[in-house]
Amino acid sequence: MSELSTVARPYAKAAFDFALEQGQLDKWQEMLQFSAFVAENEQVAEYINSSLASGQISETFIKICGDQLDQYGQNFIRVMAENKRLAVLPMVFDTFVSLRAEHEAVKDVTIFSANELSQAQEDKIAKAMEKRLGQKVRLTNQIDNSLIAGVIIKYDDVVIDGSSRGQLNRLASALSL
C-alpha cells in the first residue's frame, strides 16, 4: 500500500499544483474522483493492466470517461497511461483530497453515532471541534449500531469516546480493579 502511495503522490501533487494555479480545485477533484471510480471497475482494471499499447488504453479510458474530463484531464490520463500508472488513480484521488484539505487547513473528522445526527447537532460538534483544533473541520457521520447513545469522534490518531458503551466499559474496568 505504501508503495502505491509513493507512486501516486507525484501525480496527485502535479494535479493539485496545476488545479490550484488554474483556480480549478473543485473541477480537478471531480475529474479525479470520476476517473478513480472508472479505474476501480473490474473490467476496466483488467483492461488498463493488459499488454495493449498505452495510447490505445488511454484513448479507451478517455472515451469511457466521456465529457467528465476536460483537455487537461485527458492529458493527465494520457501521461499516467504512458507510464502504466492508471491503476493508481484511486490513490491519486485520495492523495489529491488530502493535499487539498491540508492546503485549506481543513481537518477531516468522523463522528460515529447510534443514529443519524441532525444538522443542529452536526453544527454544534463542528463548532466545538473547530475551537478545539483551531482550524476548520469537515464532518462525516457514520452510523454504528453497536453504540447505545452518544458519539465517538475520530480525527488523525485521536479518538474521543463520548458514547454510553464507552462509559459502561470504563465503569466495568473501574469496578474490576
Curated annotation (Swiss-Prot):
Membrane topology: Peripheral membrane protein
Membrane among keywords: yes
Main location: membrane
Entry annotated with the keyword Acetylation: no
Function, in words: F(1)F(0) ATP synthase produces ATP from ADP in the presence of a proton or sodium gradient. F-type ATPases consist of two structural domains, F(1) containing the extramembraneous catalytic core and F(0) containing the membrane proton channel, linked together by a central stalk and a peripheral stalk. During catalysis, ATP synthesis in the catalytic domain of F(1) is coupled via a rotary mechanism of the central stalk subunits to proton translocation. This protein is part of the stalk that links CF(0) to CF(1). It either transmits conformational changes from CF(0) to CF(1) or is implicated in proton conduction.
Family of this protein: Belongs to the ATPase delta chain family.
Protein name (record): ATP synthase subunit delta
Organism of origin: Actinobacillus pleuropneumoniae serotype 5b (strain L20)
Gene: atpH
